[in-house]
Amino acid sequence: MINSKTKLLGLIGHPVEHSLSPTMHNEAIKDKDLNYVYLAFDVESENLKDVVNGAKAIGWKGFNITIPHKIEIMKYLDKIDNDAKLIGAVNTVKIENNKAIGYNTDGIGARLSIEEIIGEVKDYNILVIGAGGSSRAVCCELAKNNNLTIINRTVEKAEIIANDLSNKLNNAVYYGGLNHNYNMANFDIIINTTSLGMYPNVDNKPPISMQNIKKDAVVMDLIYNPKETLFLKEAKEKGCATINGLGMLIYQGAKSFEIWTGVKPDINIMKNAIIDIL
């Protein structure tokens, strides 16, 4: 029940009307019997600074940041977590002692989603398709303990991420273009971070051949609408374990929830809340 002691959490983005986050977080709040509420706010870029200052002034506990504000928000924060600095984007802000502190939980969300299937993600050969914002978050997390190759239509974008991570993590990260004929048997985990195959363009997929993919490979697509992309269907036909983007969405949200409240939410509660409305 909302009262004068209810703590405020939220989502800042533009647009936000189709977001699954309020449903997911409010179910987790209800399950843990916490006096919080999570709301979505459609905010234009020119109002971001005012939102951060206002959130501190009225005592918000924190908020998520989504498209298109994940980079711009950084200039208005008092402190930024090291992983978020490496990624170059923030998706979670905690308000503490009148300070706005930025985090990025996207990469952690991807890793935990994969670990549901195979356990600890360490010492694997991983192929990441795409070099956008989501790719950077995933790569920053997975490059710490794995052998990473990033491929992208514009090779220079993949090169930038690979060089950044190689320099900052002291771990070689490889890169290439989409027109190369890659031996898929070399990879244990393959992740599509592009929008190819997302609704309504469900007949699209990354131009990657599954011909000699390992049967015990794990194939992940960050897309969750549709729940099974053409990319995942082809991988499943080859005997691979497949993961859509729902797990990443849930786990990144769960990590944000824990950062704000100090409480670990029930993953299944969050998952069922989303499945019920999809």
From Swiss-Prot:
<keyword id="KW-0560">Oxidoreductase</keyword>
<feature type="binding site">
    <location>
        <position position="224"/>
    </location>
    <ligand>
        <name>shikimate</name>
    </ligand>
</feature>
<feature type="binding site">
    <location>
        <position position="91"/>
    </location>
    <ligand>
        <name>shikimate</name>
    </ligand>
</feature>
<protein>
    <recommendedName>
        <fullName>Shikimate dehydrogenase (NADP(+))</fullName>
        <ecNumber>1.1.1.25</ecNumber>
    </recommendedName>
</protein>
<feature type="binding site">
    <location>
        <begin position="152"/>
        <end position="157"/>
    </location>
    <ligand>
        <name>NADP(+)</name>
    </ligand>
</feature>
<feature type="binding site">
    <location>
        <position position="245"/>
    </location>
    <ligand>
        <name>NADP(+)</name>
    </ligand>
</feature>
<dbReference type="GO" id="GO:0050661">
    <property type="term" value="F:NADP binding"/>
</dbReference>
<dbReference type="InterPro" id="IPR041121">
    <property type="entry name" value="SDH_C"/>
</dbReference>
<dbReference type="InterPro" id="IPR036291">
    <property type="entry name" value="NAD(P)-bd_dom_sf"/>
</dbReference>
<dbReference type="InterPro" id="IPR046346">
    <property type="entry name" value="Aminoacid_DH-like_N_sf"/>
</dbReference>
<dbReference type="Pfam" id="PF01488">
    <property type="entry name" value="Shikimate_DH"/>
</dbReference>
<dbReference type="Pfam" id="PF18317">
    <property type="entry name" value="SDH_C"/>
</dbReference>
<dbReference type="GO" id="GO:0009073">
    <property type="term" value="P:aromatic amino acid family biosynthetic process"/>
</dbReference>
<feature type="binding site">
    <location>
        <begin position="19"/>
        <end position="21"/>
    </location>
    <ligand>
        <name>shikimate</name>
    </ligand>
</feature>
<keyword id="KW-0028">Amino-acid biosynthesis</keyword>
<dbReference type="InterPro" id="IPR022893">
    <property type="entry name" value="Shikimate_DH_fam"/>
</dbReference>
<feature type="binding site">
    <location>
        <position position="222"/>
    </location>
    <ligand>
        <name>NADP(+)</name>
    </ligand>
</feature>
<dbReference type="InterPro" id="IPR006151">
    <property type="entry name" value="Shikm_DH/Glu-tRNA_Rdtase"/>
</dbReference>
<feature type="binding site">
    <location>
        <position position="66"/>
    </location>
    <ligand>
        <name>shikimate</name>
    </ligand>
</feature>
<comment type="function">
    <text>Involved in the biosynthesis of the chorismate, which leads to the biosynthesis of aromatic amino acids. Catalyzes the reversible NADPH linked reduction of 3-dehydroshikimate (DHSA) to yield shikimate (SA).</text>
</comment>
<comment type="pathway">
    <text>Metabolic intermediate biosynthesis; chorismate biosynthesis; chorismate from D-erythrose 4-phosphate and phosphoenolpyruvate: step 4/7.</text>
</comment>
<dbReference type="GO" id="GO:0004764">
    <property type="term" value="F:shikimate 3-dehydrogenase (NADP+) activity"/>
</dbReference>
<dbReference type="InterPro" id="IPR013708">
    <property type="entry name" value="Shikimate_DH-bd_N"/>
</dbReference>
<feature type="active site" description="Proton acceptor">
    <location>
        <position position="70"/>
    </location>
</feature>
<feature type="binding site">
    <location>
        <begin position="130"/>
        <end position="134"/>
    </location>
    <ligand>
        <name>NADP(+)</name>
    </ligand>
</feature>
<dbReference type="Pfam" id="PF08501">
    <property type="entry name" value="Shikimate_dh_N"/>
</dbReference>
<keyword id="KW-0521">NADP</keyword>
<keyword id="KW-0057">Aromatic amino acid biosynthesis</keyword>
<dbReference type="GO" id="GO:0009423">
    <property type="term" value="P:chorismate biosynthetic process"/>
</dbReference>
<dbReference type="GO" id="GO:0008652">
    <property type="term" value="P:amino acid biosynthetic process"/>
</dbReference>
<comment type="similarity">
    <text>Belongs to the shikimate dehydrogenase family.</text>
</comment>
<dbReference type="InterPro" id="IPR011342">
    <property type="entry name" value="Shikimate_DH"/>
</dbReference>
<dbReference type="GO" id="GO:0019632">
    <property type="term" value="P:shikimate metabolic process"/>
</dbReference>
<feature type="binding site">
    <location>
        <position position="106"/>
    </location>
    <ligand>
        <name>shikimate</name>
    </ligand>
</feature>
<comment type="subunit">
    <text>Homodimer.</text>
</comment>
